[in-house]
Amino acid sequence: MPPSIAVIIPCLDEETAIERVVRGMRAALPESAIYVYDNGSTDHTVEKAAEAGAVVRTEPLRGKGNVVRRMFADVEADVYVLVDGDGTYDAAAAPRMVQRLLDEQLDLVNGARVSSLAGAYRAGHRSGNALLTWMVARIFGDRFRDLLSGYRVMSRRFVKSFPAVATGFEIETELTVHALELRMPVGEVETRYDERPAGSVSKLRTWSDGLRIVRTIVRLVKEERPLQFFFAIAAALAAASIILAWPVLQEYERTGLVPRFPTAILSTGVMILASLSLTCGFVLDTVTRGRREMKRLHYLRERAPVPAAHGVSSTIQRRGVSGST
């Protein structure tokens, strides 16, 4: 029996694009179930999505992360196609991404955006994405080229083991780190990235959302790499302690006296804080390893992607689709 596919589309005030997105996904994956989760639109997004044939649901808590959390909890399928409702992603790439996930038994296929249009991918967003992708690659592993892509194909065990915490656009960072931390089999496919349709406005605020993503990366480092995080703090504190103590030690070596007691006490206190920080790092590293093992066991409880040997690959090639509702 072929795997079921669900296309899940978070959106907010996308009346100019949502109908085209739904119809495009229906043409690319005609046997899939398409869900549009509205995040409190004030225009005709809900009506347009329903007219296009999507199952429309609402999430009152504002923020893309809240919508993704709700979709992952509500929708049941074997394969999930997550795509933004702004009309910038190429629906025709979906069958290729689904096929790769099934053929190679991957848990995540990321759609790496490629665009030759100057207005499609703003320079600030491009450079910010490159910087954030580099940061995550240095800390968690270099397996993706587009950290903030809103176009992903995921297995059921990826979705149902994902503990969504983010509330906004930083959800993409969490999705990526989830795959990297559990060492899941992943892949990446280049996809065309187009301009938004006329009248559609991006909800991404370059600076504020960029800072939220940076804070998310710092939080994930603290939670997933506590030893490195607290070692860095301990090293900074130890360096400050040594800098404070150095003139006191020189004075003691020269005169045999310690006339600067406040500085000596401060230096000692800072070094104690450094030791405590390092101790916290070791303790939390042990806790994190246990938590990661539990997440891995929960991940393994879910069904794996169906391999191509079950005839799914030929179905995609023949009809541009795999799965049933």
Where are these regions (language model features)?
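Hydrophobic helical membrane-anchoring modules
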Residues: 1, 165-166, 171-325
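Cell-envelope/extracellular polymer assembly enzymes that use nucleotide-activated donors
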Residues: 4-6, 33, 174
